[in-house]
Amino acid sequence: MKLNKKIGLIIIDGLGIGKEDNTNAVHLANPPTLNYLINNFPTLQISAAQQNIGLLENQAGNSEIGHLTIGAGRIILNDNANINNYMKSVDYESAVLSNIKNEIVHIVGMYSNGLVHSNYEHIHWIIKQIIKNNNQVVLHLISDGRDDYPYGFAQFIEQINALKKQYNIIVKSLSGRYFAMDRDQRWERTQKAFNAMFVKQDKICEKTFLEVAQSIANSYKSDEFVQPVVFNDDEKYNLKPHQKVILANYRSDRMRQLAHLLKPNKKFHYNNPFLVQDVNLITLVPFPDVDAIALFEKQNLNNTLGDVFNKHQIKEARIAETEKYAHISFFFDGGVNKYYSTKTQYLIPSQKVATYDLCPQMSAHLITKTIIDHYFDHDVFIVNYANPDMVGHSGNMQQTIEAILSVDHEIRKLYDFFEKNNGVLMITGDHGNAEMMLDDQKQVITSHSVNDVWFIITDNKVILNSTQKFSLANIAPTILEYLNIAQPIQMTATSMIKKICE
């Protein structure tokens, strides 16, 4: 199918709409290109959080559910909510867990209230299932500090100690997510976390779990950066062949490297020097390219935007840097890896820096160059610029401003190029972050927000419906109406277009 215009769906990660004050890096950046587009083209403020995209009340959006919702064109029950429904069912009992008897079972999970990658209540549920059959639980904790408050882990100390006593749990290790949940193949980080969890150490931490947890605020930039520590060096609690490891995070992108160190797969080429043979891996939901038994099924999403493009032989390009590559591929396609002859995916390597506030421009210029270089090869471009989110997570206001201005500069180049070459940009965010860097007490916020995001279309022939509240779910139907393509019945959201003038 030949399109009259090329479309660029530009997702600016972590760019929300906030108060116009000094807590808002977007306001302080005063990005000239975005300001120009907002003031001169059809624009709406749309929801990227809470019930409007299938989350809980007051729950912030995130990149996974954001891209999932944009690609699906409908409100989706996310993994957290889906798992909760199973766990709350009186009749539900996991056949997998109930068959584990008289064993040592390792549980790895991020103990957080952020609900982006994990839910600490899921760890509780797994423990309760496991201890029914005379099993010994060895717990490997991951601290957050990124999707939760920077030092939010301290609030869980009493709760974790109560769990230890009630169920005779061994808390063997603690690692910040910076190490345990890397997703950019910085294997030295993942290996360090793995070693603390599963490998015999020459030296263990001289402090107790309680002492370490209480001292994080004085020792680290945030919970995210806690160095992997070992609290128990008893040989019998090191990982052995044929033992079971349960990964209690439901989101796969930041667990796949650790999973690879436990059970190697063809996706990665890194070799674990301390590989334990024949480990039995269990996950909450299926992880792509991971050899594991899943406790719960994921929803099967058909007729996503990518499916529709493929059906109509529309050539699309998916472009993002490493940090967000899974979002414009796996998540955008409904939480599965789909391969179409009509789709080309371009992976732009992320900069190799410790944290992105050290390089706020990231690889944005290479993303833009890739779009322009391949403009005439494709009909539609699905693009993610990661800067406001990845730098916003650092809590560094000035560098987040730089990140926003870097993306704004790239948007200017894209707008000029698309305008000259019969193209239209549709610009949005997947969730808020950079617009809310400080709370009312001027304390740093590193997590996402519940704020709305922009939807901009650079075509003044389009009149958007300003009388209705829309969300990320309405973007796919809007694209299809703009292209005059019938919307599949599975896309239950509606288009935001009121009228297209001749």
Swiss-Prot record:
The active site is at S63. Its EC number is 5.4.2.12. Binds 2 manganese ions per subunit. Pathway: Carbohydrate degradation; glycolysis; pyruvate from D-glyceraldehyde 3-phosphate: step 3/5. Mn(2+) 1 binds at D389, H393, H448. GO terms for cellular component: cytosol. The keyword Glycosyltransferase does not apply. The keyword Isomerase applies. GO terms for molecular function: manganese ion binding; phosphoglycerate mutase activity. Gene3D superfamilies: Alkaline Phosphatase, subunit A, BPG-independent phosphoglycerate mutase, domain B. GO terms for biological process: glucose catabolic process; glycolytic process. It catalyses: (2R)-2-phosphoglycerate = (2R)-3-phosphoglycerate. Keywords: Glycolysis, Isomerase, Manganese, Metal-binding. Substrate binds at H117, R146, D147, R177, R183, R251, S252, D253, R254, K324. Mn(2+) 2 binds at D13, S63, D430, H431. Its cofactor is Mn(2+). It comes from the Bacteria. Monomer. Belongs to the BPG-independent phosphoglycerate mutase family. NCBIfam families: pgm_bpd_ind. Catalyzes the interconversion of 2-phosphoglycerate and 3-phosphoglycerate. This is 2,3-bisphosphoglycerate-independent phosphoglycerate mutase. It comes from Ureaplasma parvum serovar 3 (strain ATCC 700970).
